[in-house]
């Protein structure tokens, strides 16, 4: 599937696995492929560009890592729109070095449109994208944590692994020694993430199968949600999914092999449980109402509003009914 601004992009093959270093997997969102590839890229005299939290954790922003130590700031998912801060201009001025850019598909596309056709030293990784939420969510959530704990944040993650890959937790360490932990699912942060995506994300064209735009990067990374315990790719601490889409992508997956388990994934598994790889995520009904409540009354009030609670009760009831009927069917078949 070709992209609109590159003529060398096609889905070649997909792989799954995780770093052979258990800590590398544990402190990454999935299997640690992005960090492993970036480490090897820097060791080969390149630089990596990715997203980090700001020093006060009120927002996320693009930055450049020239050392392996600087890569740590890119680790774990950021579910908010990242500030660009002139990053496209900055990396275009980098001379005589290879550059690895890691970002959302639309941001990768923007980089190539800005860069032009002379991209010999530019390598790209796009992340399977569900649509980021507004930076205000991070700002409000972080401010509330600081207020409740009477301290500044020194570490924050929305994909913390307590005892395994799933479920996801929000976790924060504070300078005064306190800690905060809560399930991401059902949190005010998660609810806002569902409701406050950019409107344009619901019609995103940077998806596998789109005939005009489609895939844009050398490699796409995400979670291998379809993995099962008996598969070679499986780890209880997380599994990355990597789709190679160009010759440069083949080079990047070869870098991953130096530090990671890399096993082939049949294409049927790539699309089975990774809907956002090939379809945009639909906009939630009530987005504007949720936004008005958030701006007027705050994040917690918006998340607890009837706008959210009534549909949630309906969905939960529907799931219980489906589960009950499935169990009845299984019982009758076994008789």
Residue locations for each model-derived region?
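Short, flexible loop segments at boundaries between secondary-structure elements
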Residues: 123-144
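A structural signal for short, well-ordered beta-strand segments and their strand-loop junctions
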Residues: 48-52, 100-103, 124-126, 157, ...
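A glycine-rich beta-strand to alpha-helix segment
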Residues: 96-118
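Short, surface-exposed basic-aromatic patches at helix termini and helix-loop junctions that form
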Residues: 112-123, 142-147
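A short acidic (Asp/Glu
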Residues: 60-61, 110-114, 134-139
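Conserved active-site and cofactor/substrate-binding residues in soluble primary-metabolism enzymes
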Residues: 28-36, 136, 199, 237, ...
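Iron-sulfur-cluster electron-transfer modules
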Residues: 1-103, 255-335
């Amino acid at each position: 599937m070709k992209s609109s601004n590159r003529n060398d992009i096609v889905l070649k093959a997909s792989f799954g696995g995780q770093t052979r270093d258990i800590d590398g997997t544990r402190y990454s969102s999935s299997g640690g492929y992005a960090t492993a590839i970036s480490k090897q890229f820097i060791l080969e005299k390149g630089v990596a560009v990715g997203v980090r939290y700001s020093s006060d954790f009120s927002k996320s922003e693009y930055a450049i890592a020239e050392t392996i130590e600087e890569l740590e700031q890119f680790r774990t998912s950021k579910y908010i729109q990242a500030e660009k801060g002139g990053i496209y201009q900055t990396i275009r001025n980098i001379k005589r070095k290879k550059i690895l850019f890691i970002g959302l598909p639309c941001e990768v596309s923007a980089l190539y449109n800005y860069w032009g056709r002379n991209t010999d030293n530019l390598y790209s990784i796009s992340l399977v994208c569900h649509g980021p939420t507004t930076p205000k969510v991070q700002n409000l959530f972080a401010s509330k944590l600081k207020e409740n704990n009477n301290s500044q944040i020194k570490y924050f993650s929305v994909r913390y692994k307590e005892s395994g890959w799933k479920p996801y937790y929000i976790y924060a360490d504070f300078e005064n020694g306190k800690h905060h932990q809560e399930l991401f699912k059902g949190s005010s942060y998660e609810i806002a993430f569902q409701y406050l995506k950019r409107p344009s994300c619901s019609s995103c064209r940077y998806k596998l199968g789109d005939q005009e735009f489609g895939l844009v990067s050398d490699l796409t990374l995400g979670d291998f949600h379809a993995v099962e315990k008996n598969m070679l790719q499986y780890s209880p601490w997380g599994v990355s999914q990597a789709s190679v889409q160009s010759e440069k992508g083949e080079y990047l997956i070869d870098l991953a092999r130096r530090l990671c388990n890399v096993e082939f994934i049949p294409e049927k598994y790539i699309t089975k449980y990774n809907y956002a790889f090939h379809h945009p995520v639909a906009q939630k009904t009530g987005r504007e109402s949720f936004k008005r409540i958030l701006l007027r009354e705050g994040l917690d009030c918006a998340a607890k509003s009837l706008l959210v609670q009534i549909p949630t009760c309906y969905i939960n009831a529907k799931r219980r009914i489906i589960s009950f009927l499935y169990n009845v069917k299984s019982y009758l078949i076994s008789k």
